[in-house]
A protein has these predicted regions:
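Acidic-basic catalytic patches of nuclease active cores, encompassing PD-(D/E)XK
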Residues: 1-46
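Catalytic cores of nucleic-acid endonucleases
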Residues: 9, 18, 23, 50-52, ...
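Short, structured active-site "lid" loops
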Residues: 39-66
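Glycine-rich, aromatic-bearing surface loops/beta-hairpins
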Residues: 105-157
Length: 157
């Protein structure tokens, strides 16, 4: 299993346990066969780029439907490149970015539409909210449980 995929699964399990319906979505799951078929020309077309930057998960409950991109950063402070946000913002401005990091709450999230385009190279963790502030069904004990799993897999205790 790829490292990034593990953290997508951790986020998925936590959301499902909290009562959200979660389905894999996008380039790394339902469209993964396209990775090997794109030419450079199709990969860099507007539609090709939209597909490549598609979010990882479709998350919904009886009140919300969200597209969610999950990123893991194993170093502290986490480096979230502005160019990554710019690409997601261009095509998926209504999505949510979840960042899994080896510090604090471990799980953070922000609506892409609320992240301002900036001149600096990186976004700071302070630009994000605690995961449970965006995904309000998630309970503190679930954050604690999945935080332990995430940190163990990051080899940080």
């Amino acid at each position: 299993m790829l490292k990034g995929s593990l953290y997508k699964d951790i986020v998925r399990f936590m959301l499902e346990k909290s009562g959200y319906y979660v389905s894999p979505y996008g380039y790394d799951s339902s469209l993964s066969e396209l990775k090997f078929k794109f030419t450079e020309e199709t990969r860099n077309s507007k539609t090709g780029r939209r597909i490549r930057f598609s979010p990882d998960l479709l998350v919904y409950d009886d009140q919300n439907v969200m597209l969610v991109e999950v990123k893991m950063r194993g170093k502290s402070p986490p480096m979230i490149r502005a160019s990554e946000i710019k690409n997601v913002k261009e095509f998926w401005n209504d999505s949510v970015l979840v960042v899994v990091v080896p510090e604090g709450n471990v799980f953070y999230a922000q609506r892409i539409s609320e992240l301002e385009i900036q001149e600096s190279d990186y976004y700071q963790l302070s630009d994000f909210e605690k995961f449970q502030d965006i995904f309000t069904r998630v309970q503190a004990e679930d954050i604690s449980y999945y935080k332990g799993i995430a940190l163990q897999n990051m080899k940080i205790k």
